[in-house]
């Protein structure tokens, strides 16, 4: 929901580029990466603090939640709406709800499974169990 770092998008012309095309500017030259097409700033395809979540992204997430059997909240306090409300929507529709988070959340008492631990430690163990 909050994006990924595999691509960057020009904030002026909305052209999408692979992240490796912008990595040199940021990592080696410590420059703001610019769009080769229009000169606009290239931004990673993530939602930055204070940015609005695109309606399309939220609607897609809600559609997926309505069809899921299990939802896992990983490393989230679940305090920021509207994304923080998605696990409760899934739970209300019959999905199993798992929380993996270092600290407690308001939803701990509603979850089917709660693991209070660092996700860096827990996720490799879960992945190994499915390997």
Predicted regions and their residues:
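Conserved catalytic alpha/beta core of Sir2/sirtuin-type deacylases, generalized to analogous enzyme cores
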Residues: 1-131
